[in-house]
């Protein structure tokens, strides 16, 4: 842990005061309220500062982990080595004509609201997705029949080497909860959405309808990372879990939601180890009962806690 902190000491002179935080507890930055500490938690306020971090990390071989809103991520209890990069201070959103340009630290919910205010339709599906714009690119986020792939036109990125590059929609390689951003180590900075002119009242009515559906069906009263598993072809993960009799099953403070079986919630100070143990238990139970292998939608990052070596 201390090795990377020492290697990165020169970064303190390259970035504004307050940008770098040592041993930052990541449970403060995830929806599940779990996870160990980051060696270095860096929050750049400009594209140039982000570029400085990436170039330094590449030159000194320091690993970089991007953390968005922490809504679809499990950070392991041992934390994250090297640099954890948060772009939440890059959160500007502008609308011109039928285009909406959003920096990737903005929330996709706020992007949806800004589109509504500009009487632009196409982002209503995102009105309840609790992630950043960048996280939405990474996962090709979607809900209620809509997805990012339908409306994203271009994205400005930084490569792993710290070079700026603009990707067009033909390069996104979107699939179900996959994209070029997850396949390659691009750091997305801003995206341009091409939307359509609409009626504000109709847009708001659609957003209200989706919000009610979400609040009715999802266990929003507990910390969680949303839907844990991808939808198997022709099936629903939640239905398979429910039919396996797993609702209410607990390991430590983690529980399969009684309200929606596709969610695993933190009901009592769960650790990431407990959470992932329950995920594996659900996967094995569903496989044994139905022969279906559930694939996780949630992303797991970081390291496990090292067990002490006994004499």
UniProtKB/Swiss-Prot annotation:
Catalytic activity: UDP-N-acetyl-alpha-D-muramate + NADP(+) = UDP-N-acetyl-3-O-(1-carboxyvinyl)-alpha-D-glucosamine + NADPH + H(+)
The UniProt record lists the keyword RNA-binding: no
Domain FAD-binding PCMH-type span(s) in chain numbering: 34-198
Single GO term (MF): UDP-N-acetylmuramate dehydrogenase activity
Keyword Cytoplasm: yes
Cofactor(s) required, per the database record: FAD
Catalytic residues in the record: 177, 227 (proton donor), 297
E.C. numbers: 1.3.1.98
Keywords for the protein's UniProt record, in alphabetical order: Cell cycle, Cell division, Cell shape, Cell wall biogenesis/degradation, Cytoplasm, FAD, Flavoprotein, NADP, Oxidoreductase, Peptidoglycan synthesis
Gene Ontology biological-process entries: cell division; cell wall organization; peptidoglycan biosynthetic process; regulation of cell shape
Localization terms from the record: Cytoplasm
Database matches in InterPro entries: FAD-bd_PCMH, FAD-bd_PCMH-like_sf, FAD-bd_PCMH_sub1, FAD-bd_PCMH_sub2, MurB, MurB_C, MurB_C_sf, Oxid_FAD_bind_N
Function in brief: Cell wall formation.
Family: Belongs to the MurB family.
PANTHER family: UDP-N-ACETYLENOLPYRUVOYLGLUCOSAMINE REDUCTASE
The name this protein goes by in its record: UDP-N-acetylenolpyruvoylglucosamine reductase
Organism field: Shouchella clausii (strain KSM-K16) (Alkalihalobacillus clausii)
Phylogenetic classification of the source organism: Bacteria, Bacillati, Bacillota, Bacilli, Bacillales
């Amino acid at each position: 842990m201390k090795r990377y902190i020492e290697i990165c000491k020169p970064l303190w002179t390259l970035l504004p005061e307050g940008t770098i935080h040592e041993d930052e507890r990541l449970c403060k930055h995830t929806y599940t309220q779990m996870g160990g500490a980051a060696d270095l938690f860096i929050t750049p306020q400009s594209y140039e500062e982000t570029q400085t971090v990436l170039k330094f990390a590449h030159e000194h071989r320091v690993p970089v982990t991007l953390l968005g809103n922490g809504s679809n991520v499990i950070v392991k209890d041992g934390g994250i080595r090297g640099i954890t990069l948060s772009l939440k201070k890059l959160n500007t959103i502008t609308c011109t004509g039928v285009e909406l340009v959003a920096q990737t630290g903005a929330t996709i919910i706020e992007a949806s609201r800004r589109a509504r205010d500009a009487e632009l339709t196409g982002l209503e599906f995102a009105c309840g997705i609790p992630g950043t714009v960048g996280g939405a690119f990474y996962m090709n986020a979607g809900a209620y029949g809509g997805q990012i792939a339908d409306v994203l036109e271009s994205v400005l990125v930084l490569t792993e080497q710290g070079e700026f590059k603009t990707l067009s929609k033909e390069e996104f390689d979107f699939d179900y909860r996959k994209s070029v951003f997850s396949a390659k180590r691009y750091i997305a900075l801003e995206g341009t959405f091409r939307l359509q002119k609409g009626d504000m009242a109709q847009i708001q009515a659609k957003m209200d309808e989706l919000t009610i559906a979400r609040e009715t069906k999802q266990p929003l009263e507990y910390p969680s990372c949303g839907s844990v598993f991808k939808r198997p072809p022709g099936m629903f993960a939640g239905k398979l879990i429910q039919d396996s009799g797993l609702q209410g099953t607990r390991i430590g403070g983690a529980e399969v939601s009684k309200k929606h079986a596709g969610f695993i919630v933190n009901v009592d100070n769960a650790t990431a180890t407990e959470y992932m143990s329950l995920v594996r238990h659900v996967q094995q139970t569903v496989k044994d009962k139905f022969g279906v292998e559930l694939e996780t939608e949630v992303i797991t990052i970081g390291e496990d806690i090292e067990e002490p070596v006994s004499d």
